[in-house]
UniProtKB/Swiss-Prot annotation:
Function: Connects the signal transduction between the two-component systems EvgS/EvgA and PhoQ/PhoP, by directly interacting with PhoQ and thus activating the PhoQ/PhoP system, in response to acid stress conditions.
Cytoplasmic side: 1-18
Periplasmic-side segments: 40-65
Organism: Escherichia coli (strain K12)
Localization of this protein: Cell inner membrane
Record's protein name: Two-component-system connector protein SafA
Membrane-crossing residue ranges in chain numbering: 19-39
Membrane topology listed for this record: Single-pass type II membrane protein
Induction: By acid stress, via the EvgS/EvgA system.
The encoding gene: safA
Signal peptide as annotated in the record: none
GO cellular component: plasma membrane
GO biological process: response to acidic pH
Amino acid sequence: MHATTVKNKITQRDNYKEIMSAIVVVLLLTLTLIAIFSAIDQLSISEMGRIARDLTHFIINSLQG
C-alpha cells in the first residue's frame, strides 16, 4: 500500500514537471513571437518587403545549394 502511494506521488511529480516544462516552452515561444512581430511593426513596409525578398532569395539559394 505504501509503495503504491509513493509511486503515485512520484508519477504525479513527473507529470507536474512535464506540464510545467511545456508551459515554459509555450511562454518562451509566445514572447519570442511578440518580440519578432513588434520588431517587424517598427519597420516600414518597404523595409519589410526588402527583408522578405532577401530572405526568399536566401532560402532558394540554400535549397539549390
